[in-house]
Amino acid sequence: MSQHTYSLTHAQRRVWFTELLESGTSICNLTACVKFRGNIDLDVLEGALNHSISRNDAIRFQLLEGEELEPRLYLTEYKYTSLEIIDFSNVEMIEIEQWIQEQARIPFKLFNSPLYQFYLLRIHNHEVWLFAKFHHIIMDGISLNVMGNQIIDLYQKMKKQDPLPDQPEPSYLSYIEKESQYLQSSRFAKDRLFWTQTFQNPPEYHSLAGQTSLQKQSTSASRDTITLSPHLGQTIRIFCEEQKINIISLFMASFYICISRITSKKDLAIGTYYGNRGSKAEKEMLGMFVSSLPIRITADPDADFLSFVRRVGREQLSVMRHQRFPYNLLVNELRKEQKDLHNLIGISMQYQPLQWHNADGFDYETALYFSGYTANELSVQIQERTDTGTIQLNFDYQNTLFSLEDIKRIQNHLLTLLENALQHPHSFIKELDMTNKREKQKLLYEFNKTEAVSPEAPTLHGLFERQAAVTPERPAIRFSGGSLTYAELDMYAGRLAVHLAARGVTRESIVGVLSKRSPEMLIAVLAVLKAGGAYLPLDPAYPKERLSYMLKDSGAALLLAQPGCSAPNFSGETLEVDMASLASEKAENDVFTPADGCSLAYVIYTSGSTGKPKGVAVEHRQAVSFLTGMQRQFPLQEDDIVMVKTSFSFDASVWQLFWWSLSGASAYLLPPGWEKDPALIVQAIHQESITTAHFIPAMLNSFLDQAEIERLSDGTSLKRVFAGGEPLAPHTAARFAPLLPQVSLIHGYGPTEATVDAAFYVLDPERDRDRLRIPIGKPVPGARLYVLDAHLAVQPCGVAGELYIAGAGVARGYLNRPALTEERFLEDPFYPGERIYKTGDLARWIPEGHIEFLGRLDDQVKIRGYRIEPGEIEAALRSIEGVREAAVTVRTDSGEPELCAYTEGLRRNEVRTQLERLLPSYMIPAHMIEMERWPVTPSGKLDRNALPAPGGAADAETYTAPRNVTEMKLAQLWEDVLKNGPVGI
């Protein structure tokens, strides 16, 4: 006779899908102990257990392997269960708990086998525990308590020899039938409408885990438990009683606020669990009923806390009225419109009341145990002991996403915010702090503790002049075809400065310097400074229109030009810098208007959001402080030689032009054009014994290729390489160490507005091996770094916020842009009288006291309804082994915004395959373009505007950008002919 089988309910189906995804694990195990204290008759207890098993069909369900992926249920006949007694009376409690945890982690045999297991544990003479383990497909947490109460009731009746109930308990089969009817009912249609309207535009899923490593997500989990202080527990209970709110509403509201701040998102969903037992019979029934459902809340920072708690409570009640609707059907409904929909629930919270109950001659309670797995990245259980008043929080967390330290921080954030909210329940949410005083102290002061800087001179040229007086005959600069000593360079600059002073250059005068990399360039810069003025660097490679704009906008009346360079349409005076003429001049007494530390030193133009570049005005004291701090952190010696290879229109040139002069070291001026050719750079390093160089990350990869070819590590003079201008990819950093093991790699970060670099990070191959992002490090001496929220409140460690820079390096402001200066240069809220610079960069502190750069705040885009940070995709791309460099942009060539990824070093199909393992599908770029050479701006940064559009050759083959004017013209001609996207070389 064939066996009758039944379909899984939707609640059971969710469990089964979890089992399929995590097969061979204990993720679906439900383990508990009913703990008895008193004189317990073990034979009677065994009889009570068996009577309960016989009367509840849900326990006796087994699984039959189906033809499809989904199994069928069938009901087995009752068989008496003899309890094995394990004696733990002479064993420490920690060993007992360990044994239980080990049992909890043993998975069940799934098919044609009992899905329950029982033992009796003798703890001591007056305490015994009934150990029970079930597969979640036949039992939920409420059922455990129901069964525990049944066993107690049966035990007492058997002890008193009272008649036992002869009717079976309500059957789970009736629930299976009832759910089938519900799915065809008008109630189901109403519930479906509620849920689909609530999540019509679902909130973006943002992980609470601030991943810094390449670990892949796994359901393997750990638990950390905290017990609230008696005072806090009592305060919570009194508050909830007075305000007539539930503890779960209070905790969930507080948790919403924490998550909102950690993820920088207001629209959030947190999962919680509902019994899903509508009738009296269902409340007494054993089986799997529980619904896991998302509660969606918008955390408005301008709402007051108490009102927000009440709103959370109303949402909980609203969800409760529609709890029967299966969660898996909700996700399926939403995926009809959004195929890329991520899981709605990543974080969950639930409330569990616990207590010891009194019975005739004994006490008892039911305790649940952790399986070692969790389907959510973080699950929080609030356990309140109603007998003692103790409140305990269990944090179950996926340990590939979180460390214990991460969880401790989240706990501290939650409790700090909760305590502040209880003291000030009518405060606006934005006013409630979740960073305690100790953490604030660490973030503001300890992490920003640097060595004090005491410059040897107040001005840039003063530093040089001081060294020229000490080591006049030492070589200051070397270049193709010659060199100049400190005394000679000082002489040339001084003689030119006389001409400048005669033309009215004085303090605050801005003088343009138009020159390729050459001794004339440095002579002109020093001459302007000596005369008291400020230099405006002008790279001849810049478009003429841009040069004209900068000269006009800066108000420069005088232009110093290298022979052969000119600026069309410049209405002021142009003075050619001719070394031969200067050498033949007679020495004159230098009579200049001396600059001081507060005088303007230089103006460097950076890209502006309006399309017009903006001039950043930097004073001597800011530049001198930065250079002094740099020398303190990375001391140069007299035998050091710094390679000057960056365009002096880019702020990284400042340390290349001046740093070496603090110690009597030398600079080597790389011939113009050589900076684009790694072979020539390596040649210069060999021939000139270069010790210090700077690269943007894209060029660093090409340099490493050449270093590998030429075995540069064999006896190289290099001591240190700085990488900056763009985020440094972990793969690039990983390549560096084996190729140049004796050379330090230093990741630098800093906007022009903070005087070159505000932070440095010295890489360590072992420590940084598994990082997802290379940190930008700690502040340079004299600087401070703050990570703040939109209200200038301190963001906790690990939480993203906007990066602000404070300290001695903060520039004067934007030239002739008072409104923009006021917008970006603010009062320092922590050091009265000082200023901070608002970078517009997203960053966070990581536990070891370093800053991690996360991207630009204004780079976020919305693609197909999802808000996406291209920098996050870039970080994932750079983490793929074999990818040397990556960039992600948003293109609208097709009429709709699409993500386009550019990569170097790995075939795009392989990149896509690897990326799909790291990111959800909605973050996978629509286009992948392979690059061999990257277009860069004259300042050496990646020129994102020059990246090729998708389609045609660029999207089909490895793309090499045009490298010079001739190639650009040829490429343009072919593009006009082919009409098929960009043409590479």
What are these regions (language model features)?
Residues M1-Q3, G38-S54, Y74-N112, I152, ...:
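A short, small/polar-residue-rich loop/turn motif at beta-strand boundaries
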Residues S2-H4, E19-L30, D57-A58, H126-E127, ...:
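His-Asp-centered acyl/peptidyl-transfer active-site segments
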Residues S2-T76, V91-Y182, Q197, P203-L208, ...:
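Acyl-group handoff/entry surfaces in thioester-processing enzymes
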Residues T5-L20, D41, M93-I100, L144-N145, ...:
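AMP-binding/adenylate-forming domain of the ANL superfamily
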Residues N56, R60, N145-I151, I248, ...:
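Extended, hydrophobic beta-loop-alpha segments that form or line the acyl/peptidyl-thioester binding
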Residues P326, D340, N358, T388, ...:
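AMP-dependent adenylate-forming
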Residues K614-M643, D651-T691:
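Conserved AMP-binding/adenylation subdomain of ANL enzymes
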Residues L662-A665, Q687-H694, L704-R771, P775, ...:
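Gly/Ser/Thr-rich phosphate-binding loop
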